[in-house]
Amino acid sequence: MHVPDHDTLLTEGVIAKFLRYVQIDSPSDEDSTHAPSTTDQWEIARLLEGELLALGLRDARVDAHAIVTATLPGNVPDAPTVGLLAHFDTFPGTPGRGVKPLIHQGYPGDTIALPSGATLSTVSHPELVHCLGHDIITSDGTTLLGADDKAGVAEIMETLCRLLRDPGLKHGPVRVAFTPDEEIGKGVDHFDVPTFGAVAAYTFDGGAQGEVEAENFNATNLRVTLTGRSAHTGYAKGAMVNALHLAGELMSAIPSTMRPETTQDFEGFLHVDEIAGNVESVTLKMLLRDFTEAGLAHKRAMLEGILTGLQQRHPGCQAKLEVTGGYRNMKVEVDRDPRVMGLALKAVRDAGVAPVQRPIRGGTDGARLSFLGLPTPNLFTGGVNHHSRTEWASVQWMEKAVEVGVRLVQLWAGERLATTAAPRKDTGSFPIASA
């Protein structure tokens, strides 16, 4: 894709950037063993590198794993370096190729009808109540929009542009990073925290206006393999052990009050995310989530108990449990430096927005970065209903996110450079193991 010139980038605004980015296909692929997981992601990575170079950020580069980094030098001596991060991959579980963005100007409060036949209303999307008169961006309803997280990418790029346009805005060094594969939990697998060199960072990867998030799930991703015994269906009595039925028993044993569709706020869950197999063998991909490590351990013990019961009730059944990944709650790391959240909350207030602190019922690149010694809470982008064909974003909320970004780096410019702890080896992830 053509790289806009310096003057265009400085003047076009955040929405022009966003519309350009969402029309570049960049879904990730959880089954891939490559980094990045899809070749599509290289196009937007190289475009962003080109745009950063066009803006005059001379150290802009995309590395061998499609991580894009650059530095905006500071104009205040001895100010600490702050980082701004977003990811450019999109969720692979919803169609994300060929996005056709639409702008619905001056939302009047009624139902928004998309060309696909899908609709958005204040009933199905209560956040729209706060967006009367706003310009709302959607896809045509056949794909997701990609506000998660190309809204964050566009907002960080526009933050840089505003700082460049107005030399009177005082700031220290600003490091930016755009990462691939966040949606599959691999966004910072190859991220070099010491080289990045920031004392704190912020992911722009949140939702509705005002959200400031410094607490996320503890997470374990699991692969459960149930092995049965196949037999001729006409002579199966006493011989067949149907792995499909075993999987049904497993799913039925998960308490109905402990599922994603029945939990909220600080409640954790067990979730069957994917299932495949036949009579002889079934594989289930499962997600365990809780805000405390004790709660997560309890859920794992519960699942292990269910599997033990299956094997006892069905001689010939075998159950294997493997941990395939996970992450931990970053709150303990973010809280080590009160400035990290304190300045974020002040930046939101200074932009005329009331901060909304709530737990992230998911994970971000920031969760793992925090355990590597780079405290990284999450800020709103103005995008809502992520991972859906009815994903949408408010233009006005996106513009507020840019205001917050600009104000945030100004506030950090007033801080004194301090010695920071050495980066940790703890990745915040659970090791691959089997049970």
Predicted segments with their positions:
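Acidic/histidine-rich catalytic neighborhood of metal-dependent amide-processing enzymes
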Residues: 129-217, 256-273, 277, 284-291, ...
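Glycine/charged-rich beta-loop-alpha catalytic/anionic-binding loops adjacent to active sites
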Residues: 128-143, 227-231, 351-352, 383-387
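A short glycine/serine-rich beta->alpha loop
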Residues: 4, 138-147, 230-237, 388, ...
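A generic structural motif
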Residues: 90, 143, 230-231, 288-296
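Metal-dependent amide/peptide-bond hydrolase catalytic core
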Residues: 2, 244-435
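Acidic-glycine-rich active-site phosphate/pyrophosphate-binding loop
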Residues: 115-135, 213-226, 346, 377
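Acidic/His- and Gly-rich active-site-bordering loop/insert found
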Residues: 4-136
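Phosphate/diphosphate-binding glycine-rich loops and adjacent basic-rich segments that engage nucleotide
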Residues: 201-236, 240-246
